[in-house]
Amino acid sequence: MTAFEQFHGDLVAAASDLGKSTPLLIAVSKKQSLEKMHLVYEQGQRHFGENYAQELADKANKMPANCCWHFIGPVQSNKIKIIAQHADWIHSLSDLKHVQKLETELQKLNRTINALIQINVDSEESKSGITKEEDFIELAEKLVRSNKIGLKGIMMLPKLHKSESELEHLAAEIKRYKALLNSIGCQNCEISLGTSSDYREALKIGSTMIRVGEKIFGKRI
């Protein structure tokens, strides 16, 4: 059994134990070789996550056409054109100016993209994401009106290994942001949350997308 098959089996079992649907597994292929990516592709994986726009472009041009590409890194204004060209999902929107530029590039390309708003739930200075509710609402309302960017939910990068009380707080925050999205017309929200280190906790509090890299690929280049 390969590392990918082992982890996927563990993920399915963990979701089943919790009475949850199996989340979408995003194979984080940052700094992973095309050879390794082809191996997990042959085992059925189709969703790949990249942190860097140029690496996304290079790999999207070389992997099979039916791969689905998730941009999960911090958004840089000068890389938005590349993201618009190659990504099917963007998990890390948190800036109105970036949204406007992305929309302009998508119009030129006649493409659409699925989007998640990144929330900096622990207000960490080292991480991107929205920290204020009013900024979240403003951005969400802009995205809901877009005909090129489909708002699908939220992404979080919380600190690992939270206590039970911290997990309860995080679950309450997820519920609050989902309610805000529902109130402006975004239903069936996706929650991009959890890695190989904390996916069980993430599943428990509602994650629908898990991002995993070395656990299924091995060490990066």
Report residues per predicted region.
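Conserved alpha/beta-domain cores
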Residues: M1-S197, L203-I205
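Gly/Pro- and small hydrophobic-enriched strand-loop and loop-to-helix capping segments
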Residues: H91, S207-I221
